[in-house]
């Protein structure tokens, strides 16, 4: 039986590299987002999250703290670990971390293919669909 993932806020260079590996596999490799779009000027100010199973990086996300909002970004789970509830666990961890830092309003740019996933977790779609990294997205928000 496979171990369950553990999630933590990145505190070391090694953990940050692991988070970037996950993001590179998912966004640059699978979705063909350019490296220049994937890694941006907000990296240094973001709270990065890493998910691992037995030391293997399987998931990553980042949170940017923007005024009253915690913006969840770069949510990624490697393909072979999807459909096991790990994305939901990653999202819960990210929301809990933002709450721990005093935030109760959350937003994200959801890929339209993932809108139902975020809606299941209490996010509501707002506005029109827009392109980000050549992928259709929609703003989604949640309070509490």
What are these regions (language model features)?
Residues 1-13:
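Conserved N-terminal entry element of GNAT/NAT acetyltransferase domains
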Residues 24-54:
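Active-site rim helix/loop that mediates acceptor-substrate recognition in acyltransferases
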Residues 65-73, 82, 132-137:
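A conserved beta-turn-beta hairpin within the catalytic core of GNAT-like acetyltransferases
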Residues 107-109, 119, 124-139:
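Conserved catalytic-core motifs of GNAT/GCN5-like acyltransferases
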Residues 98-111:
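Conserved GNAT acetyl-CoA-binding A-motif
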Residues 50, 56-64, 71-76:
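Conserved beta-strand in the GNAT
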